[in-house]
């Protein structure tokens, strides 16, 4: 068995990429908190209270509505690379090589 010489590098890069993405996410969250604090919008605190007391069904509906457009976007994105891959396959070239051999 030949081990992938880049496995260690790939693993390290994956960890570093995840750490970078996490840091960016946390920075964005902190910025949002700072903005909401400056505006003095008390919307988030009542939402926290509602989560514990009621409106669990409302939360689920809101989450579903957010997920559906994302799924649609993913499907569109998935279709485009599939269309690009078909011309790039170059199957006749492989057949020509076999014919030459």
Swiss-Prot record:
Q: Where is this region: Disordered?
A: 31-101
Q: Where in the cell is it found?
A: Cytoplasm
List of residues that carry Phosphoserine: 36
Record bears the keyword Ribosomal protein? yes
Domain of life assignment: Eukaryota
Cross-link Glycyl lysine isopeptide (Lys-Gly) (interchain with G-Cter in SUMO2) lies at 2
Q: Which residues lie in Basic and acidic residues bias regions?
A: 31-50, 81-101
Q: What transmembrane ranges does the database entry give?
A: none
Modified residues annotated as N6-acetyllysine in this record: 8, 28, 35
Q: Which GO terms describe its cellular component?
A: cytoplasm; ribonucleoprotein complex; ribosome
Compositionally biased intervals (Basic residues):
51-71
The Swiss-Prot or TrEMBL record describes its family as follows:
Belongs to the universal ribosomal protein uL4 family.
Q: Sum up the protein's function in the record's words.
A: Component of the large ribosomal subunit. The ribosome is a large ribonucleoprotein complex responsible for the synthesis of proteins in the cell.
Assembly with partners or alone: Component of the large ribosomal subunit. May bind IPO9 with low affinity. Interacts with RBM3.
Protein name, entry field: Large ribosomal subunit protein uL4
Originating species: Sus scrofa
Q: Which gene encodes it?
A: RPL4
